[in-house]
């Protein structure tokens, strides 16, 4: 059903990914077939597959370059859903996770920074979060943030006085902007790879993900599974 669509120019958007109208149509069919978000718990409308089940399904769905996003198993949403389900409070899951699982919004992980900030080494992150009157004030710069231009929900990693801390914010909040969409070689994920500037973004403490100072551990948990799922998908190519 999906693989033949790769043969038609009309299936692609200008960034060489599946166009949104076609994607939405296929996603409805995937949901009707009961194969939507298979990596999520049954209690959150998934199939409850563990790593072994995921490996078999992810390999097969990536026989097509369109496959993972059609099943809601593509990066960065895949890893973001995993860590929100594992770390988030129930209130955070309802607000930030469920809309991603349902396919209502996309998400992004804002971690990587230009030099001298944290690139491959998150411990070098310079983006700063300062606590004041129940809110965290964010200032700094990120780049190569996958999917940012199409995302509504963001996980942000910033430096606090006790180490690194993870936060959640919505695209409509003031105090941040996408400076540019960075060109890359080959097809792009929906939302591209973007440079982001934070200038006084305010995040209430209720939208902190996990404990203060535990952000590095949180993203390593998230990235650990993401590295495995990338391999699962690549085997299918």
What feature does the model see in each segment?
Residues 141-179:
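A short core secondary-structure module
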Residues 1-75, 86, 91-95, 99-102, ...:
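Amphipathic, small/basic residue-rich leader segments at the start of a protein or domain
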Residues 177-237:
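Glycine-rich beta->alpha junctions and the first turn(s) of the following alpha-helix
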Residues 49-51, 120-123, 147-152, 189-190, ...:
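Short glycine/proline-enriched turns and hinge-like loops at secondary-structure junctions
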Residues 116, 143-149, 187, 225-229:
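Glycine-rich phosphate/pyrophosphate-binding beta-alpha loops
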Residues 81-87, 109:
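Flexible, glycine-rich active-site loops centered on histidine and acidic residues
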Residues 103-113:
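A short, Trp-centered hydrophobic/proline-enriched beta-strand micro-motif
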Residues 116-125, 131-136, 145-147, 159, ...:
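Hydrophobic, small-residue-rich alpha-helical packing segments that form membrane-like cores
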């Amino acid at each position: 059903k999906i693989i033949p669509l790769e043969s038609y120019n009309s299936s692609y958007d200008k960034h060489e990914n599946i166009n949104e109208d076609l994607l939405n149509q296929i996603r409805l069919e995937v949901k009707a077939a009961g194969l939507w978000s298979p990596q999520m718990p049954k209690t959150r409308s998934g199939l409850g597959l563990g790593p072994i089940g995921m490996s078999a399904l992810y390999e097969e769905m990536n026989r097509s370059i369109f496959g993972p996003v059609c099943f809601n198993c593509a990066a960065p949403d895949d890893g973001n859903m995993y860590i929100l389900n594992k770390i988030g409070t129930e209130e955070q899951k309802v607000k930030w996770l469920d809309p991603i699982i349902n396919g209502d919004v996309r998400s992004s992980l804002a971690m990587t920074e230009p030099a001298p900030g944290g690139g491959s080494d998150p411990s070098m992150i310079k983006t700063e979060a300062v606590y004041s009157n129940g809110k965290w004030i964010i200032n700094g710069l990120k780049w190569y943030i996958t999917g940012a231009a199409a995302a509504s929900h963001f996980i942000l990693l910033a430096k606090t006085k006790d180490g690194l801390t993870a936060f959640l914010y919505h695209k409509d909040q003031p105090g941040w902007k996408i400076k540019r969409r960075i060109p890359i070689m080959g097809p792009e994920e929906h939302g591209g790879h973007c440079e982001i500037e934070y200038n006084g973004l305010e995040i209430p403490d209720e939208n902190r993900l996990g404990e203060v100072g535990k952000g590095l551990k949180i993203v390593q948990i998230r990235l650990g599974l993401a590295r495995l799922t990338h391999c699962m998908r690549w085997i299918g190519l």
